Amino acid sequence: MKKIKKTLSIVGLGLIGGCYAKTLRDEFDVIYGIDLDEKALSYSESQGIIDKGFVDPKIPLSKSDLIVICLYPNLVEEFIEKNKDNFKSNSVITDAVGVKGDMIDRVIEKLPSNIDFVGAHPMAGREVQGVWNSSKEIFMDANFIITPHPSNHLKNLDLIERLAYKMGFKMVTKITPKKHDEIISFTSQLSHAIAVALVNSDEKNFDTNVFIGDSFRDLTRIAMINEDLWDDLFMGNRKNLIKKIEKFEESLDIIKDALKKEDSKSLKEEFKRSTVRRKEIS
């Protein structure tokens, strides 16, 4: 891919913001970081992750051709509102928010007509926080979702897609924000809800650590959770998530009922179904 030779600003220099900066380091002449955490900015400058850090976004936004917003869901709209007059003319804005809802419509209404906002969601992360834990490998072979809006220019949708592949994502999918939230409630949010519930159901009447195997570790890795971020994500998509939790409860009840009735046939059928489906997914 040919180098873009333009300026990039990353708003929110945490884990995902750091991954964007590292994976796009060679694609832009200048990368600015915008964050309220001066330690994160100082660290990123010293490591060459960004060229310069700013607490006040006005100057970097006015110079940037592409802006990637890596803030919590409830902060994105507020940031756009406060800075709608600071963006460079004809710049492109994208985000990394895990729940879309009506946010994209509201954001586009606030922006000047010559600014294009392309919704996106990198399906990657870790159970740790901070730019110091970011790496190029986090995005490698992960999935990337773009949620196009009717007002988006095709060239800008293509830009975000090309950059996603450059960052290491193996697949880029375009879907509506509504469909995104419905699917994510199952593939991401329900998984986190199950992991949290599993860990919290530990009765602590024995030394759990002595009896843990790979299955428990694999299922509960994501239970080490950023409570502020995931509260935002769960609450912002609660209607979809509640439906998926209820569907999961139905499936779990089938197993529970089979155990109560000593019904090995039904239990084995559930095992067979999950094995077939898991092979299809992988």
Which positions does each model-derived feature cover?
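Rossmann-like NAD(P)(H) cofactor-binding subdomain of soluble oxidoreductases
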Residues: 81-132
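Internal alpha-helical scaffold of NAD(P)-dependent oxidoreductase catalytic cores
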Residues: 138-221
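Short glycine-/small-residue-rich Rossmann-like dinucleotide-binding loops
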Residues: 71-73, 97-98, 122, 150
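Hydrophobic Val/Ile/Leu positions in short beta-strands of Rossmann-like dinucleotide-binding domains
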Residues: 9-10, 69, 146
